[in-house]
Regions:
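Bacterial extracytoplasmic/cell-wall-associated proteins, especially those involved in peptidoglycan
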Residues: 1-144
Length: 144
């Protein structure tokens, strides 16, 4: 939530959280939230690829840049959040995550949306979806 929507309103952050949950609750996507977030093509790190004797469990796989479901995961930038103690948006995002995960809150805010994009891009997949909401800088869609 923080990585995808920290510059959005609370409603915008909730909407992003609901997309993740809507996917986790739909058999077309993985059932675990983390698996939904990390879904996408990967490649093996050159460090482990050069060693043919490694076990599969010892190999390191990385997301292909700009090819995953949630852009922050594969943008190539560090994922560390600086100064979480004084970061209000971080605290809000964590509170929203708790409410959505623990209590399945705000279920109708994006009417079952399972896709979204920033309003400054126009991905081709949007043409095959039903537009359900516009919240802040994001446009939300439902794939039937």
């Amino acid at each position: 939530i923080y990585r995808e929507a920290n510059n959005q309103s609370i409603a915008g952050m909730i909407a992003v959280a609901r997309v993740v949950m809507n996917r986790a609750q739909d058999r077309r996507w993985p059932a675990k939230v983390c698996d939904v977030i990390y879904e996408g093509p990967v490649y093996e790190s050159w460090k482990t690829k050069k060693n043919p004797d490694l076990k599969d469990s010892e190999r390191v796989y990385l997301p292909k840049k700009n090819r995953c479901q949630f852009s922050w995961y594969c943008d190539g930038k560090a994922d560390e959040v600086i100064n979480t103690e004084n970061n209000i948006q971080w605290k809000v995002a964590n509170s929203i995550a708790y409410e959505v995960l623990a209590f399945d809150r705000w279920n109708g805010i994006v009417e079952g949306a399972n896709h979204y994009h920033a309003d400054y891009v126009q991905p081709d997949w949007r043409k095959r979806m039903q537009l359900v909401a516009r919240i802040d800088d994001h446009i939300f869609y439902r794939m039937e």
